[in-house]
């Protein structure tokens, strides 16, 4: 299965402020995620990302209503309708494959991103780099021992001053 990591980040690689706020990110990032997710048909989140998005004001989860959505959690979480639970990256991918998917998006948080990278499960990386720098924050990857080499596929200025960087993982 092809696994695509896609994240909206600050210029210095943060996905959220120290307290979890994503207010520095443009709404264009969400729209781009929704468009990609609709093309692929599914995505994987960690429990903390699921919890954070569930608390956003508005009906953001309606944007992904028809998609297969997996939340990875070591402690079973109460999920809203349309989400399924998995206990590991491999379990999440197995559940999506069983539903006929051959591609999946992962989009955080840091711990889940690191677990996929550590297991060498990521095939492509898309970073939407926002024009902000955070002194403190939550990085794309939590501190874990792994090395993933990348080859730049494309770079493009998209909405506003956001730059999309696309990489393929080299093995």
What are the residue ranges of the model-derived segments?
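Enzymes that bind and transform nitrogen-containing heteroaromatic metabolites
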Residues: 1-171
């Amino acid at each position: 299965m092809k696994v695509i990591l896609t994240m909206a980040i600050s210029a210095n690689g943060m996905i959220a402020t120290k307290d979890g706020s994503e207010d520095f990110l443009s709404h264009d990032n969400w729209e781009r995620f929704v468009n990609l997710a609709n093309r692929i048909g599914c995505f994987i989140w960690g429990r903390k990302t699921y919890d954070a998005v569930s608390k956003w004001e508005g009906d953001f989860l309606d944007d992904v209503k028809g998609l297969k959505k997996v939340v990875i959690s070591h402690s079973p979480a109460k999920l809203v309708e349309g989400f399924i639970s998995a206990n590991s990256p491999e379990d999440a991918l197995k559940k999506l494959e069983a539903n006929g998917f051959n591609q999946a998006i992962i989009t955080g948080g840091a711990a889940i991103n690191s677990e996929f990278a550590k297991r060498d499960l990521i095939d492509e990386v898309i970073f939407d780099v926002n024009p902000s720098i955070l002194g403190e924050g939550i990085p794309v990857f939590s501190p874990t021992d792994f090395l993933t080499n990348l080859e730049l596929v494309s770079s493009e200025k998209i909405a506003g001053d956001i730059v999309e960087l696309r990489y393929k993982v080299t093995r």
